[in-house]
């Protein structure tokens, strides 16, 4: 145990001298205190998840001159390797991925990126209207979505439900489902569920109320729509069904007609 602590201290001291590369090409010393705080935030309220262990694993994956945007990726990889030790590490890993996604989306929309605070509700509320407008402008979202009361829907978002994701579920959404432009994801998880809900509620008489009902159901994970609905609801290609059933006679002419 003493040797392990000594190795950890030596490892930490050596990383105090590392430089990280910023987006403008300049470099600055690695802020180990900030990194430790970020990891503490990802571990909050997760039993059997050890902040120090994730920090040690992350430091092993850092190198001098590493781009600052790569540090979150190193953190994700490091936390992911610990899932075998305790299942709760999957939630810590998902939170690290969430932080990356928040930064990616808010940077794209030119919004403040200091999002890992206690004000997730304010961030989502402010972000949501920008997200809808940009999605419409990029011809990714149905212009009819702008006819909804976006203020009301933004306030109905439940940012705390972002914490429900396991790493694999969030990574799957990130890789396959979230809206993106030029390979940049700008759709956050709760906006994703609300976009689907809005697409489903477009023809309803009280469409905002119905959208909120659909959103609350989807974002609770009590019900999940089929893949075509997740892909297409609220977009310019509103195909919602997975398949179509019809009746044909038992001969090739009918089958191919």
Task: Annotate the PLM regions.
Residues 1-257:
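Extended catalytic cores of very large enzyme megasubunits
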């Amino acid at each position: 145990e003493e040797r392990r602590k000594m190795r950890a201290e030596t490892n930490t001291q050596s990383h105090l001298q590392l430089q990280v590369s910023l987006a403008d090409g300049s470099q600055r010393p690695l802020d180990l205190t900030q990194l430790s705080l970020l990891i503490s935030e990802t571990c909050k309220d997760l039993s059997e998840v050890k902040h120090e262990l994730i920090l040690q694993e992350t430091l092993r994956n850092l190198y001098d001159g590493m781009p600052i945007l790569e540090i979150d990726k190193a953190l994700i990889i490091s936390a992911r390797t610990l899932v075998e030790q305790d299942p709760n590490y999957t939630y810590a890993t998902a939170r690290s991925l969430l932080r990356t996604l928040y930064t990616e989306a808010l940077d794209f929309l030119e919004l403040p990126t200091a999002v890992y605070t206690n004000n997730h509700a304010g961030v989502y509320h402010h972000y949501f209207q920008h997200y809808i407008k940009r999605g419409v402008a990029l011809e990714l979202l149905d212009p009819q979505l702008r006819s909804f009361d976006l203020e009301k829907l933004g306030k109905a978002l439940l940012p705390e439900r972002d914490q429900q994701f396991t790493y694999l579920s969030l990574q799957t959404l990130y890789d396959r489902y979230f809206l993106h432009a030029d390979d940049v994801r700008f759709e956050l998880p709760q906006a994703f569920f609300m976009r689907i809900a809005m697409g489903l509620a477009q023809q309803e008489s009280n469409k905002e109320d119905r959208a909120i009902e659909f959103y609350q159901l989807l974002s609770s994970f009590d019900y999940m729509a089929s893949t075509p609905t997740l892909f297409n609801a609220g977009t310019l290609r509103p195909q919602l069904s997975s398949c179509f059933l019809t009746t044909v006679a038992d001969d090739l002419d009918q089958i191919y007609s």
